[in-house]
Each structure stands twice: as C-alpha cells, then as structure tokens.
C-alpha cells in the first residue's frame, strides 16, 4: 500500500483515474480483510467524494508542516466526524474502496498528521475502523470515539485549541449528525473543513416544514433547520441553492473562515450533492476546485461505474477503454 493521491499534478484524465482507482480500490481490498463483516455501503460515485477529500490533503499537509509545524511547533490534526468503518462497498457490484479516514491518512504520509480523531456512532464499525487504521499505519496516533458527534465535538474542539491546525471532514449520511451543536464547535477550530452537503434533502425538509408546520414532525424539521442555519431565514429561501448559501454564509461569518469552494458530485441515480471546502486559503481552494472538478466532469469522471468494471476485470482493459479527451 504505497500509492498516494497527489494534489495539483497536471495529469491527463486517464492517468489521474488510474492512480485514484489503484489507490482507493487496492487499499480498500486490503482493509476489507480486517473485520470483513463491517463495511459502509454507498454508490459508485462515492469514489468522487473520497477523491475530493483526499485531494485537499495534498494542499493542506505540506503547507501546515512547513508554515506552522516547523516554524512554530504546531500540531497538525485530522478529524473525521462521521468516519464509518474505513471501508466502502459499492451497492452495484460490491467493489471496495478505502474510506475517507484511511484515504486522508495515506495521502498525508509524507507529512503525517500528529493527531487523528475519528467519530463513529456504531461501536462495531468504530472498532473495525480502529483496527484497520492500526494495521495500516501502526505509528499513527489515532483516537476513535464511539459516540454521536454532538456528544464529543466540544471535547474535540477543546483538544484542538492549543497550537493545533486541523483538517476536519464532516461527511454525514443525509442529515445524520448535521446539527450546529454537533458540527459548529469543530467548524470554529483553526484550520480547514470539508462538508458533504445534501442540498436536495435539505430543500425537501424546508419545503415540508413550510407547507405543513402544524404537524409535530414537520415542526421538528423546521426547528432543526433553524438550529443548523442560525435563524429562520430558511423560510424565505426560494431555491435549494439559496438554502445552501445560507449555510455557507453562517460558516463564513461565525467560524473565522474567509473563503470557500464547492464541487458538485453527481449521483448514480441522478441528482447531486456538494463537497464544500471552508478555508482561509482562497487561491488554493480555487486550485482544488479546478483540478478536481475537471476530473469529475471529464468523460472518465462521468463513467466511474465503467472504470470500476475495468478495474475489476468485468470489462475490457482500462487502457483500451479510456481515450484522452
């Protein structure tokens, strides 16, 4: 397991995806053999999300090392707030990927994190994640919390206060764990954060809460949106994009982040969700968006299912299938 996703390289699309497939699939196959009964199940296009998360490590870790660790003695931390088991299985064909947490740690091996904290509410998946990380990177300092993020975020944030720069990943399943009480303390921490934002789901929640607020369950949806977004301006949102903008604005205003960039991840079944990066490094955020978005929108990015079939030997070879655009 010695292949890493490197950021900012001017690779052709086929080279980029060959490297990414090797990295995520080969490491996923290796990690799956540890606690094989416990994996997370997603669609093929979750690979694009994992690429987005790992790619930012290529910007973040060397800069944090040179500008803060070496000069001022900072610790460099990685926090995965909804970490899962560390292995993803695709629903369509059962291919394995390494998850966001091992993917980020492997991508940072040249400038490794001093501190790694992962949160996984399912104790069996959390235990599998810990064993996988210990096997994969035995020298890495890793803490896994088997709790809801709302119960541990304050404690994690306190741990990150003293001379620590962090990269925080907030990658929920739809709404799970998406409360300001849970994610707000971490978004306030010094460093960068990446949030998976399910725009369509939040828009449906908003529409339901506005249309029938006399029902208790729908009232609860409205209260949840108010808690997450900071006020009831969501009621006036005229589109899903406007609702997303309200969330982004709150993070920028309340959490000492000065820039953001977002990448649209297409879903296999149609629709999309966003990967939103919050940072102070506006130029680097634009570079991240440019590089990753170009790959996702290429013919290769649009045909992840075919690439996985090639990788698994279910169709012709990768070099025969891929043509440079």
Question: At which residue positions do the language-model features occur?
Answer:
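A short, conserved alpha-helix within the catalytic core of class I
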Residues: 175-186
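Flexible, glycine-/basic-rich loop-and-beta segments that form/coincide
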Residues: 282-312
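Conserved proline-anchored active-site loop of SAM-dependent methyltransferases
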Residues: 76-91, 162-177, 195-199, 278
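Short amphipathic alpha-helix with an adjacent loop that forms part of the alpha/beta core around
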Residues: 152-162, 184
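Class I SAM-dependent methyltransferase Rossmann-like catalytic core
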Residues: 14-75
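Conserved beta-strand signature within the Rossmann-like core of class I S-adenosyl-L-methionine
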Residues: 190-204
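A conserved mid-domain beta-alpha-beta active-site/ligand-binding segment of alpha/beta enzyme cores
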Residues: 205-274, 279
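SAM cofactor-binding core of SAM-dependent methyltransferases
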Residues: 48-155
């Amino acid at each position: 397991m010695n292949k890493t996703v490197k950021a900012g390289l001017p690779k052709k699309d086929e080279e980029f995806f060959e490297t990414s497939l090797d990295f995520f699939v080969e490491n996923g196959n290796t990690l799956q053999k540890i606690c094989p009964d416990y994996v997370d199940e997603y669609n093929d296009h979750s690979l694009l999300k994992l690429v987005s998360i790992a790619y930012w490590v290529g910007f973040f870790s060397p800069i944090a090392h040179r500008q803060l660790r070496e000069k001022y003695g900072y610790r460099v931390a990685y926090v995965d707030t909804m970490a899962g088991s560390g292995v993803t299985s695709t629903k369509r064909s059962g291919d394995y990927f390494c998850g966001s947490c091992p993917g980020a740690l492997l991508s940072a091996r040249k400038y490794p994190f001093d501190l790694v904290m992962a949160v996984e509410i399912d104790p069996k998946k959390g235990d599998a994640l810990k064993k996988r990380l210990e096997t994969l990177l035995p020298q890495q300092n890793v803490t896994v919390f088997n709790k809801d993020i709302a119960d541990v975020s304050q404690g994690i944030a306190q741990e990150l206060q003293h001379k620590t720069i962090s990269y925080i990943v907030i990658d929920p399943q739809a709404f799970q764990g998406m409360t300001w009480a849970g994610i707000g303390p971490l978004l306030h921490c010094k460093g960068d954060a990446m949030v998976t934002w399910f725009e369509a789901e939040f828009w449906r929640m908003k529409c339901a809460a506005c249309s029938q607020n006399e029902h208790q369950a729908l009232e609860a949806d409205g209260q949840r949106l108010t808690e997450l977004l900071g006020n009831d301006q969501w009621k006036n949102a005229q589109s899903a994009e406007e609702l997303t903008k309200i969330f982004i604005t709150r993070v920028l205003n309340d959490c000492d982040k000065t820039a953001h960039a977002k990448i649209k991840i297409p879903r296999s079944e149609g629709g999309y969700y966003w990967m939103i990066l919050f940072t102070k490094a506006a130029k680097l955020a634009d570079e991240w968006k440019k590089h990753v978005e170009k790959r996702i929108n290429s013919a290769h990015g649009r045909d992840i299912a075919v690439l996985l079939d090639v990788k698994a030997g279910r169709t012709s070879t990768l070099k025969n299938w891929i043509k440079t655009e």
